[in-house]
Amino acid sequence: MRRVTYSPSYTLVPTYECFNRCTYCNFRAEPGTDRWLSLEQAEFRLRSLPSGSVIEALVLSGEVHPKSHRRTAWFRRIYDLCDLALRLGFLPHTNAGPLSYEELAQLKRVNASMGLMLEQVTPALMQTVHRHAPSKQPEVRLQQLEWAGELRIPFTTGLLLGIGETAADWVDTLTAIARLHRRYGHIQEVILQPHSPGSSQTEIGEPFAPERLTETVAIARQILPADIALQIPPNLVSPQTLLDCLAAGATDLGGISPIDEVNPDYAHPQADALAAQIRPGGWRLVPRLPVYPQYDDWLYSAIRERVQGFREWISETGQLEPESGEHDADR
Ligand SMILES: O=c1nc2n(C[C@H](O)[C@H](O)[C@H](O)CO)c3cc(O)ccc3cc-2c(=O)[nH]1
Ligand SMILES: C[C@H]1O[C@@H](n2cnc3c(N)ncnc32)[C@H](O)[C@@H]1O
Ligand code: SF4
């Protein structure tokens, strides 16, 4: 049976507050109105997870303006949350919007991989869905991908589909990702994320037409180098569309967490249910780490050792539970 991967994950949200206002967002809170996640709360939540059930700590955040006086404290909290997750035996993956070169370099110390969606490179969206979202400027996001390449950070990016772009725009965005990967070799996966309206977005947009996703997968597979994984979020598509996307070249189902914080109206299926859902297509669902194996030697040694421990565990047991049942790497 052919393999399809997913990452057993748990999402930590340092803050929902965000200075951008993407019209499709169901995540953001107004700056100043949201309490930040404390390290104590985060530790409690991570320690409450059934042992051996989760590998990735996805640190997903709203953004504080780069020039705000609160930026340093915000960044510090993100760094500390990653450091905590690592100490508790998880592998962090951070997506906190565009970061400065120095911030990226710092977070590399405490992350197995990082990510930022390119969304779409057409500047036209800065007049529509992104008109109040300066951090969605294509140049800013392209710059971030370039810096991640220079810093040798295994990186996840992707396209948000159905936000007013054309099919020609998909080609431009995918071509930009392919070009960056040919230069730096750091793009581990590309997410094809269908815009999915939720109950708290500021403008109700149309959902991305599911029939078109298969077409997008085929185009992405043609444009992207073969070593880049293609990720489809299984909670945002129908079971049939998911099978069609796998047949068209999708290889991964992303992080599966108790709650999809970005799209809280769409429950993540449990891994068992997902495995059963794709089995009729001849697909076997297997867990993966947030960093793909070809990047292990880019990691700082403390993270690399942790990663290699997880790899041995998955290959020995073929499943997730560690033999000791212990998930605390401190000891
Ligand atoms: O549960 C989710 N995980 C999301 N993830 C998590 C992602 O699936 C995994 O963290 C990576 O595949 C690494 O394992 C993102 C990660 C990124 O770097 C960029 C965007 C996303 C978007 C989502 C999302 O909408 N929902
Ligand atoms: C973290 C990523 O989640 C995506 N994102 C934000 N809002 C939505 C939505 N309503 N539907 C689907 N994806 C969304 C964006 O692509 C962002 O970069
Ligand atoms: S999608 Fe990200 S950048 Fe846009 S408003 Fe939501 S949290 Fe902020």
Predicted segments with their positions:
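Auxiliary Fe-S-binding modules of radical SAM enzymes
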Residues: 171-331
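Acidic/polar, glycine-rich intrinsically disordered N-terminal extensions of enzymes
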Residues: 1-5, 299
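Short acidic/His/Gly/Ser-rich catalytic and metal-binding motifs that mark active-site loops
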Residues: 21, 123-126, 198-201
